[in-house]
Amino acid sequence: MKTLLLCVGLLLSWERGQVLGDQLVSDNELQEMSTQGSKYIDREIQNAVKGVQEIKTLIEKTNEERKTLLSVLEEAKKNKEDALNETRDSETKLKAFPEVCNETMMALWEECKPCLKQTCMKFYARVCRSGSGLVGRQLEEFLNQSSPFYFWINGDRIDSLLENDRQQSHVLDVMQDSFNRATGIMDELFQDRFFTHKPQDTFYHSPFSYFRRPPLHYAKSRLVRNIMPLSLYGPLNFQDMFQPFFEMIHQAQQAMDVHLHSPAYQTPNVEFITGGPDDRAVCKEIRHNSTGCLRMKDQCAKCQEILSVDCSANNPSQNQLRQELNDSLRLAEELTKRYNELLQSYQWKMLNTSSLLDQPNEQFNWVSQLANLTQGPDQYYLRVSTVTSHTSESEAPSRVTEVVVKLFDSDPITITIPEEVSRDNPKFMETVAEKALQEYRKKKRVE
């Protein structure tokens, strides 16, 4: 009978959360432990706010760097387009001349085409693989419709430059649009009084304390979405404060990410323009319009002879124009490559900005998830329910303290504290709260 009464007594003590070995933990002690743990959670919430403000500073710095790079990019774009215009002008003037050396070039072209087709199809079958039959028919038609004069003036290189220019302009427009929408959202966000007014340290104390801080009334924000409509000195209200913020962060990141990994966003590769290897780009161009096959002219002697045909004896002016065309073409290719390098740098800057927007979600999103909590009369967001002490089950047994807490809306969380951190240690509840918050964040990430 005594044993039964003892078990009932222990169970009742456990239910009231007052067991620590043989020593009772009073309600006042549990309350004080809850207060100390809640203060740590409060500091972590304030750190989340500071962290977001640091992200704001980084984004502003990145934006200034982006503007500088954009200025360089615009200048490079102008130089490239000037060179392209000169190339097109020279091409137009050259086409206006009657075709000279026509018989010589046509004879060489008839010998060039079979070699070019064979070389291209071997490459396609080995590297590109899919759809060789269709590509072969398209190539046959393309070569029959092409002129050796087009070949002679490097028309394929000119067309590639023009197509590349179109793609580069599109990529830049997409990046600018996505960045402008993202920064517009961020500007709206950081204009809110939540970020523009800071509490004075002399008046600040924990929102978990018993006393309300005196209210300070600010003019209502012009934002439709107000992040913190109540006083900064009132108790924390997660629904009003954090949820709208993280929704806007998510919107800003979506505005940038919508195009970041799409094919339209990828900068065109120009290595093949100046002779560099880029098999994927060549495969794509061959499938698109067969002009990629013309890049293999160096492997066919008769094709090379077409490029070497000298018509200056028949028309010196035409030869001079061709030289001007080749010079402007080389310059345009160099400037196009340089512009593409700058465009890729700009793209990396944009990706870096997107990753900065991701940091608040990674580090502080747990705070926004508190928005669904019911703000009840309970002033504690970490409440200690039980404290027990026993010997650990390990190869080297030692005394440990187990603390069961509820953090926000969580199920009970059991935290084990080694004997090195005694309950009298000022760091005891900070350690408990830190481990509880780690468990809480881990579970929220899984959910």
Swiss-Prot record:
GO terms for cellular component: chromaffin granule; cytoplasm; cytosol; extracellular space; intracellular membrane-bounded organelle; mitochondrial inner membrane; mitochondrion; nucleus. Proteolytically cleaved on its way through the secretory system, probably within the Golgi lumen. Proteolytic cleavage is not necessary for its chaperone activity. All non-secreted forms are not proteolytically cleaved. Chaperone activity of uncleaved forms is dependent on a non-reducing environment. Coiled coil: none annotated. Disulfide bonds join C101-C311, C112-C303, C115-C300, C120-C293, C128-C283. It is found in: Secreted; Nucleus; Cytoplasm; Mitochondrion membrane. This is Clusterin. GO terms for biological process: chaperone-mediated protein folding; immune complex clearance; intrinsic apoptotic signaling pathway; negative regulation of amyloid fibril formation; negative regulation of intrinsic apoptotic signaling pathway in response to DNA damage; negative regulation of protein-containing complex assembly; positive regulation of apoptotic process; positive regulation of intrinsic apoptotic signaling pathway. The modification Phosphoserine is found at S132, S394. The gene is CLU. Glycans are attached at N85, N102, N144, N289, N326, N352, N372. The keyword Transmembrane does not apply. Antiparallel disulfide-linked heterodimer of an alpha chain and a beta chain. Self-associates and forms higher oligomers. Interacts with a broad range of misfolded proteins, including APP, APOC2 and LYZ. Slightly acidic pH promotes interaction with misfolded proteins. Forms high-molecular weight oligomers upon interaction with misfolded proteins. Interacts with APOA1, LRP2, CLUAP1 and PON1. Interacts with the complement membrane attack complex. Interacts (via alpha chain) with XRCC6. It comes from Oryctolagus cuniculus (Rabbit). It is a peripheral membrane protein. A motif (Nuclear localization signal) lies at residues 77-80, 441-445. Belongs to the clusterin family. Keywords: Chaperone, Cytoplasm, Cytoplasmic vesicle, Disulfide bond, Endoplasmic reticulum, Glycoprotein, Membrane, Microsome, Mitochondrion, Nucleus, Phosphoprotein, Secreted, Signal, Ubl conjugation. It comes from the Eukaryota. InterPro entries: Clusterin, Clusterin-like, Clusterin_C, Clusterin_CS, Clusterin_N. GO terms for molecular function: misfolded protein binding; ubiquitin protein ligase binding; unfolded protein binding. Residues 1-22 form the signal peptide. The keyword Signal applies. Functions as extracellular chaperone that prevents aggregation of non native proteins. Prevents stress-induced aggregation of blood plasma proteins. Inhibits formation of amyloid fibrils by APP, APOC2, B2M, CALCA, CSN3, SNCA and aggregation-prone LYZ variants (in vitro). Does not require ATP. Maintains partially unfolded proteins in a state appropriate for subsequent refolding by other chaperones, such as HSPA8/HSC70. Does not refold proteins by itself. PROSITE patterns: CLUSTERIN_1.
